[in-house]
């Protein structure tokens, strides 16, 4: 059909029926519909409407057979019309057919449509799409059901409206305030400004405390405040906190400083005894104390870190890998395995003695941890027979730890490692290069990325670079260019280039791209590290490692270039520790002595008399030995002393070693030094009998050496003396003539700032003396005029004379005679030779600083003398008096001695004319320097001595 048929009912508007397939769908979905309570008013009316619908449906079926080829646009129009009809509340009902309540009569559908599956059918049944069986009840029941449905729908609509209003009100109350602030944010201040402290807020006080106890003090304050909160006198503090970056300080918030002092009273480690010990934090700095700025340290594979705690605390480790979440890192370190499990309850102290661990000690603490040692499965298996290591591929597993190539590989959390200021030393780096010694590991440092070390110690490197340093750019576009540092601004360094093509140009480069530059022949000084303050000559430069020849030990030392700088002076390094110097002979124990050949920061390298090298601490040394007067006999029977150049002529090193004598021990062992030998700092030992001088001693050499001995020029002494024996004696006296006679005296200070202090003279220089005080253990330097000698037993004070060898006594001056031990017979002689102790007393020339020898100028001597001594002959300890004073030299001696024989220098032979310098020989002409020799003519300087002509005050 080409024309549309309009059917208009009384209760609805006009509706166009389209003769297409849409009508079938309407019949399908309208076959059974839910009961409409408003449409059940009149049965007849419903039947009439149903008949009209049926008739119309039959007409539509006929139209469908004829118009199967109509366009789809008509179908869309019909759907719109259907929606309009539904919106107006118009419903069509099919003619009600009689149904049996016990039979399930399905709706009649087209064959073209697919059957609904069970799930869709159930869903449609729940939605009311398929009408269920309705019992044939009365109309009242249906009307009541319809009314109930209406009320239920009305109640649901009211409930939905109410819930929406309540929800809107709740949201308005919750977010209304922030919305107002958000609306005002364009013209109002930042809200965070309201949280800043002001003068009306409580003050913040800094409390000093013991470093390391900050957290304990804060927790104690919190517990104390909670305990006293409900008492009659609660703590009046508001808060307490500490910062890990500020050690030794705890911050307490309170209104008054007295409240802080009261709160901290009784806390161990808190130093808040009074308000003056507190520090008031300014208001502008209060907020900064609560800011937390997390520093992200990027951990690079191959970098260096240190362990924070546990058995490996402080040990250097190399990063192998980093986990994906960045919380754990794989480390490579040198293991610490206890190979003495039986001694697990013991530890070794600094003296090498075993001690028991305390009750609270642990085997993993730093004090009792085993030493670093590379993993050796054989040694571990011997130490732990029940817990042997197992091999898995290239790894060894022992006690749940993995070991590869002798190193321990372990996963550690990032919080347990130190990534800043690691500063690995060259000794530690060489161990990770695959060798345990520095000499062998230096050549393999190529396996270690030393640039990572520079990155790890970046701040230290920048601090060590100073203006005028020679530097080199080693990375970037300008790599290989060098110059002089002109200025440093934070992390930027200004360099004046000295390159051939870029002479005098100024460039700025990052500090991390610059390193110090040295060339062979430069004289450098070590600024930090194990060899600090040591100087030397650069012999080799390889990347970041510089090798120099030490001025102190004459050995090659390798250090990082960042730790050294150029120096003009020749330093001695750490040459003195606790009073011990290089090449000192020290006593280690009752049977062992040794010579120091290397000085480290806190220890010495000592070569003992058996040839063994030991490392000792200063407190392990008993004393320092003085061998300046020691001598020994060489291979030919000649004397050798310290300073002689000798060579070995016997033994395994015959004709191979030579050197200078440093020390002689027990006249048998000789310590020698040769700068050409690198082993043990050039120090070695030898037997005295296996040595001989490099230049053999001849008669002419001896004569030339002893040419200054004036005793050989005296014909009387040379004719009457015994010869060679006296030569040795005279030489011995001359050797002892230059000693410091004040050294070792107990003195008291009578002037100056140290008045009344007592001490002991250690050395004198001119008129100044160096005193070691006994009360404060402090060395000072004072004048000899400010000192008096104190008797340590009686406490008697004696004036200390600056000249001569002894202190003055009553009536004369003390001292020796001539330098050869004999006294001059000239009564008017006023002094001795320049080699003697000083001049003699001359009655016509005034007092002299040395002893007087002769008849006049009374010296306080004891012997009898016709001119200067007693007139009464007195027999002293050896002989009687002669007619002219002095001893006759023969009295009461056994056996008898020829007074004119040439017995000079012999003992017990006594010659009155040739006994000068002998002890206890007595010679009236040469006893000036003998003790207890008594000579009336040469008794000056003896105490007690009495001379009636010397004005001795008695």
From Swiss-Prot:
Subcellular location: Nucleus
Source species, domain of life: Eukaryota
Keyword hit for Repeat: yes
Gene Ontology cellular component terms for the protein in this record: DSIF complex
Recorded GO MF terms: chromatin-protein adaptor activity; mRNA binding; transcription elongation factor activity
Compositionally skewed regions (Basic residues) per UniProt: 89-100
Biased composition (Basic and acidic residues): 1-25
Region (Disordered): 1-125, 696-723, 797-834, 933-954
Family under the similarity heading: Belongs to the SPT5 family.
Chain's role: The SPT4-SPT5 complex mediates both activation and inhibition of transcription elongation, and plays a role in pre-mRNA processing. This complex seems to be important for the stability of the RNA polymerase II elongation machinery on the chromatin template but not for the inherent ability of this machinery to translocate down the gene.
Protein name, UniProt field: Transcription elongation factor SPT5
Organism per entry: Mycosarcoma maydis (Corn smut fungus)
Biological classification of the source: Eukaryota, Fungi, Dikarya, Basidiomycota, Ustilaginomycotina
């Amino acid at each position: 059909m080409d024309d549309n048929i309009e059917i208009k009912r009384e209760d609805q508007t006009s509706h166009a029926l389209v003769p297409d397939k849409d009508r079938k769908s309407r019949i399908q979905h309208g076959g059974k519909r839910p009961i409409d309570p408003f449409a059940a008013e009149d049965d007849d009316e419903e039947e009439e409407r149903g008949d009209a619908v049926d008739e119309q449906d039959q007409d539509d079926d006929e139209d469908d057979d004829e118009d199967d080829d109509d366009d789809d646009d008509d179908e869309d129009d019909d759907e719109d019309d259907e929606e309009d009809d539904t919106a107006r509340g118009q419903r069509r009902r099919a003619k009600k057919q009689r149904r049996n309540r016990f039979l399930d009569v399905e709706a009649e559908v087209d064959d073209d449509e697919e059957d609904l599956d069970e799930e869709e059918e159930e869903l449609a049944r729940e939605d009311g799409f398929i009408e269920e069986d309705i019992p044939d009840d009365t109309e009242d029941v249906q009307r009541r059901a319809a009314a109930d449905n209406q009320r239920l729908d009305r109640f649901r609509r009211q409930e939905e409206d109410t819930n929406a209003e309540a929800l809107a009100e709740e949201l308005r109350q919750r977010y209304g305030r922030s919305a107002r602030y958000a609306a005002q944010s364009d013209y109002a201040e930042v809200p965070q400004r309201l949280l800043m402290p002001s003068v009306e807020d409580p003050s913040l006080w800094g409390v000093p405390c013991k470093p390391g106890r900050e957290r304990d003090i804060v927790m104690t304050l919190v517990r104390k405040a909670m305990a006293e909160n409900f008492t009659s006198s609660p703590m009046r503090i508001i808060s307490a906190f500490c910062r890990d970056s500020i050690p030794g300080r705890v911050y307490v918030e309170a209104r008054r400083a007295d409240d802080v002092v009261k709160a901290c009273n009784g806390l161990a480690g808190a130093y808040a005894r009074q308000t003056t010990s507190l520090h008031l934090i300014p208001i502008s700095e209060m907020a900064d104390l609560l800011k937390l700025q997390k520093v992200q340290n990027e951990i690079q594979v191959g970098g260096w870190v240190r362990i924070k705690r546990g058995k490996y605390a402080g040990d250097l480790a190399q990063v192998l890998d980093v986990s994906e979440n960045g919380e754990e890192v794989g480390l490579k370190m040198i293991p610490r395995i206890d190979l003495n499990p039986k001694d697990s309850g013991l530890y070794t102290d600094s003296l090498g003695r075993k001690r028991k661990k305390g009750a609270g000690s642990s085997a993993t603490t730093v004090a009792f941890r085993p030493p670093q040692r590379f993993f050796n499965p054989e040694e571990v298996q011997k130490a732990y027979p029940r817990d042997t290591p197992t091999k898995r591929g290239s790894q060894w597993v022992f006690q749940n730890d993995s070991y590869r190539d002798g190193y321990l590989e372990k996963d550690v959390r990032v919080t347990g490692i130190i990534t800043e200021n690691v500063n690995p030393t060259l000794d530690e780096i060489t161990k990770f290069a695959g060798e345990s010694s520095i000499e062998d590991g230096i050549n393999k440092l190529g396996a270690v990325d030393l640039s990572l070390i520079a990155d790890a110690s970046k701040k230290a490197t920048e601090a060590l670079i100073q203006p005028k340093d020679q530097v080199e750019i080693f990375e970037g576009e300008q790599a290989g260019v060098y110059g002089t540092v002109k200025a440093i601004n934070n992390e930027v360094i200004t360099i004046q280039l000295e390159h051939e093509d870029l002479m005098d140009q100024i460039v700025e480069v990052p500090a991390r791209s610059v390193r110090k530059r040295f060339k062979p022949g430069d004289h450098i000084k070590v600024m930090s590290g194990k060899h600090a303050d040591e100087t030397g000559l650069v012999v080799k430069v390889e990347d970041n490692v510089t090798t120099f020849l030490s001025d102190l030990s004459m050995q090659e030392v390798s250090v990082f270039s960042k730790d050294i700088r150029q120096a003009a002076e020749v330093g001695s390094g750490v040459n003195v520790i606790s009073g011990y110097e290089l090449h000192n002979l020290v006593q280690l124990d009752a049977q062992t002595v040794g010579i120091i050949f290397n000085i480290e920061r806190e220890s010495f390298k000592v070569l003992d008399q058996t040839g063994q090298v030991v490392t000792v601490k200063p407190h392990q040394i008993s004393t320092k030995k003085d061998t300046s007067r020691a001598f020994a006999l060489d291979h030919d029977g000649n004397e050798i002393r310290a300073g002689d150049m000798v060579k070995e002529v016997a033994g395994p090193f015959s004709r191979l070693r030579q050197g200078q004598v440093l020390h002689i021990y027990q006249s048998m062992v000789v310590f020698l030094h040769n700068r050409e030998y690198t082993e043990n700092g050039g120090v070695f030992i030898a037997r005295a009998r296996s040595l001989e001088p490099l230049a053999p001693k001849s008669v002419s050499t001896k004569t030339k050496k002893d040419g200054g001995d004036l005793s050989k020029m005296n014909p009387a002494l040379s004719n009457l003396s015994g010869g060679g024996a006296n030569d040795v004696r005279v030489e011995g006296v001359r050797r002892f003539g230059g000693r410091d006679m004040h050294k070792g005296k107990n003195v008291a200070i009578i002037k100056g700032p140290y008045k009344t202090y007592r001490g002991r003279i250690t050395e004198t220089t001119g008129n100044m003396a160096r005193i070691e005080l006994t009360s404060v253990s402090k060395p000072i330097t004072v004048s000899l005029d400010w000192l008096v000698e104190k008797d340590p037993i009686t406490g008697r004070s004696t004036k200390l004379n600056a000249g001569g060898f002894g202190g003055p006594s009553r009536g004369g001056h003390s001292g020796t005679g001539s330098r050869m031990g004999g006294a001059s017979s000239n009564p008017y002689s006023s002094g001795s030779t320049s080699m003697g102790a000083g001049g003699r007393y001359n009655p016509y020339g005034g007092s002299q600083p040395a002893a007087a020898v002769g008849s006049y100028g009374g010296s306080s001597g004891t012997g009898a003398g016709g001119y200067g001594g007693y007139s009464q002959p007195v027999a002293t300890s050896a002989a009687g008096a002669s007619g002219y004073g002095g001893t006759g030299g023969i009295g009461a001696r056994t056996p008898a001695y020829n007074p004119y024989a040439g017995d000079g220098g012999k003992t017990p032979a006594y010659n009155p004319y040739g006994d000068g310098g002998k002890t206890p020989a007595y010679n009236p002409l040469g006893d000036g320097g003998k003790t207890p020799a008594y000579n009336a003519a040469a008794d000056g300087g003896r105490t007690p001595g009495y001379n009636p002509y010397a004005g001795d005050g008695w």
